[in-house]
Amino acid sequence: YTDSPDLAVSDWLKWTEDGDPYWTRFYAENSREMLYDWVIDLGVEWNRVAMGGFENSLPRFHFTEHGALDVVQALVRTVIGLPTVNFIWNKRVESILVDNSHVTGVEVMDVRTGETRTLKGEHIVIATGGFEGNLDKVLSNWIPDLPKPERLLIGASVHARGQGLDLASAAGAKISNLNRRYIYTNGIVNIRDPEGVMAVTAGNNDSMRVNTDGVRFTNEGGFDKNILKDMLSLGTATYWAIFDEPGRAGFAMRGAEWVNTPTDRHPLLDNPMITSKSMTLEELAELAGIPADRLVSSVARYNAMIDAGEDSDFNRFPEMNNIPPRIERAPFYAMQFYPMTRKSMGGVVIDADGRALNDSGQVVPGLYAIGEVTGSAGINGKHGMDGMFLGPAVVTGRVAGRTIVAAHAIRDEKIRIRTPAAEDPLPDPSSWVPTLTEDELGTLLTTSREGYWHFETSHEMVLERQYGCTQCHSAEVPFFPLNNRTSKSAQVELCSNCHGRQF
């Protein structure tokens, strides 16, 4: 097939309805050089390309073997190796400093000790992501013309709270379109979350979807923005995916650390807290709390349309090769789904150079924003596109970086780099041994400590998967933090022990 920037722009603007025309075209014309080729030079291997969502008339959604992990690892691995880049770990920005309308630095707090300090800089780049982990902020900036769901799950990072937006606004930046977001319709409750608000992304292409009345209500394979509208119009904004034993193989999920077994054999399918399971449809309906006669009738009609090769209700399978399997062989399954937050599509308004703008459209001197905190520069418009969040984050980041370098070049001056602290020495490999037992680690995890979220989450997985200490730790990565680039580089390579796993 033959693709072109013009065709990509046409496809994307049609889908998003009002995506930012400048950034849409810029991405179409420059993402090959600024993203695809660039990360290849950093060691990333693209291994397949797919259509992605319905927004593409040709395959454009590129994948690596382990997803975003491969790209993130390559970027972090590269930047850690740069002697001119300094890292300050476990700090949270409390405020952006402004002097005479110019941004001059940040006030930060150590999340473990509470100590504060000031960091000065002529150019401050906000790259804090969206706010889809903040339900209060999401619901107070809800999508116009769509009903608010009774129950909305969090499908974004627990750290996506929107602090970067608040910081930017306080520094004078304009914030827009906070009521635009990519809501997924396939969220199930994360059984590991005691509050029942965190989601896992799941789905089954071999299922049919019914509402609380047991009636099929949407084209399961249709446009996700149409499915969202159908789902939120249900009143209760929840549905059940109905499938049978052969259809169990169609189940898939992602987005949780504990997803570490082949999904068609995952115990979640046999967990009554998430999945109702029965030898008859009547009993299944009773377990799920939906009318039995309507569920039985809906399945019978669904099977009849499959036999006829025509979905006269929702046109799910207009072509014979897209026909899903019948639902007929016990045991039968019903899995309840809810809408879930995912990605922010509004945020800090920026210009073509990645500089933050104020309410008057003027540059906020010294302030930049990139990625999801800008709503991906408005590329996604009103309707999100697959693969169009990580990519624009990289591209807008590079745009801002080039702008900063150019600003110094115009003034014919070097960028001032703070002299890094002397590196800590690595332990002697010949004498290094693990010093923490499994019981001691378990005891350490019984109490949550401020600033140790990643430590606690990762080590809970260590105990669950029965990893030995040397799965991750060595003389290069000892049991205590080191200010040492060799150690940090070694840590980067360990991310795949938990993330991006393939089964």
Q: Where does each model-flagged region fall?
A:
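Helical element adjacent to the flavin cofactor pocket in flavoenzyme catalytic cores
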Residues: 63-122, 165, 169-171, 349
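An anion/pyrophosphate-binding glycine-rich loop and adjacent beta-alpha core
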Residues: 165-167, 171-290
